[in-house]
Amino acid sequence: MIQQLEITLQPKSRGFHLVTGEIMRQLPKLPKTGIINIFCKHTSCGLSINENADPDVRVDMETIFNRLVPENRPEYEHTLEGADDMPAHAKSTLSGVSLTIPITNGRLNMGTWQGIYYCEYRNYGGARELVVTIIGE
């Protein structure tokens, strides 16, 4: 069985957001065994798997990414869409825009402390579209 659907994440402020529940609420029943791929159709945000318990991790991740890719650098040429746009593209490349997660016994087979992060790198990115592909039996 292969299923593919598009889902929408509601607009979020800049930062790292735990969205496991928001994604799962929009999905059909998962197969007993398989894989799920989640792909973000945008160039200034990303997806990641990281700790789901302590919200300080999300704050620290934002701090780290901002230090790795600062805004307002004179060497940036792509500046028409604002000071946060070119850094957002670079951060998206660093985090990636796709996740593949195993499905076991009809559930995402992630570690106890793992959750799906949506990483918004723009000050305001709007709603974001994800393509979800479920392969399983």
Description of each model-found segment:
Residues M1-E137:
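Active-site histidine-anchored catalytic micro-motif
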